[in-house]
Curated annotation (Swiss-Prot):
Enzyme Commission code(s) on record: 1.6.5.2
Protein name: NAD(P)H dehydrogenase (quinone) 1
Matching InterPro entries: Flavodoxin/NO_synth, Flavoprotein-like_sf, Flavoprotein_WrbA-like, FMN_Rdtase-like_dom, NQO
Keyword terms of this UniProt record: Flavoprotein, FMN, NAD, NADP, Nucleotide-binding, Oxidoreductase
Organism: Rhizobium meliloti (strain 1021) (Ensifer meliloti)
The Flavodoxin-like domain, residue ranges: 4-190
Length: 199
């Protein structure tokens, strides 16, 4: 049984929702799954004034525990075409793991969100891939076997690089049924590959 970590940062709850869908998919494929978040860097008064969702029950991860999993699925919103600094800050503390090769051969994957259709979803995930490769991870995306990313009948996130959701400029749009389905598919896909590699 593969051990999968869904590691995320979510300011307004969209990525939190996607993270739980990813975890659901991984569990459906037989994985043991932990959902954890990275620490918030924004001062609490600023976060409250900005209406951040601060009541997220997922525990905060430690850098060292990343080595305990067979797969890590990273999730964070897009900030100006790149990953939110909270997740980047956490990842940038993994030098000790890198030096010891602790993540070599583990599966890595990512999902994201943006305010608009062309708000940097692909560039955000692509920006995380070099980090995974420097760690020697096996990168897995969201293949076109997931047919939900085909077609143009509705506004939706998602690409071969990973699942994503579009939040709207005011954050009022929640992940759609097809976006959540994509997240579940990606979680299951990662879990199956991780299980094969762990054998």
């Amino acid at each position: 049984m593969a051990r999968v970590l869904v590691l995320y940062y979510s300011a307004y709850g969209h990525i939190e929702t996607m993270a739980h869908a990813v975890a659901e998919g991984a569990r459906s494929a037989g994985a043991e799954v932990a959902v954890k978040r990275v620490p918030e860097l924004v001062p609490e008064d600023v976060a409250k004034a900005s209406h951040f969702k601060l009541d997220q029950p997922a525990p905060v991860a430690t850098v060292e525990e990343l080595a305990d999993y067979d797969a890590i699925i990273f999730g964070a919103g897009t900030r100006y075409g790149t990953v939110a600094s909270q997740l980047r800050n956490f990842i940038d503390q993994t030098g000790g793991l890198w030096a010891k090769g602790k993540l070599v051969g583990k599966v890595g994957s990512a999902f994201t969100s943006s305010a608009t259709q062309h708000g940097g979803q692909e560039s955000t995930i692509l920006g995380l891939i070099p980090t995974m490769m420097h760690h020697g991870m096996v990168v897995v995306g969201l293949p076109y076997a997931f047919q939900g990313q085909m077609g143009v009948e509705e506004v939706k996130g998602g690409s071969p690089y990973g699942a994503s959701t579009i939040t709207g400029g005011d954050g009022s749009r929640q992940p759609s049924a097809v976006e959540l389905e994509a997240a579940r598919f990606q979680g299951a896909h990662v879990a199956r590959i991780a299980a094969k590699l762990a054998d």
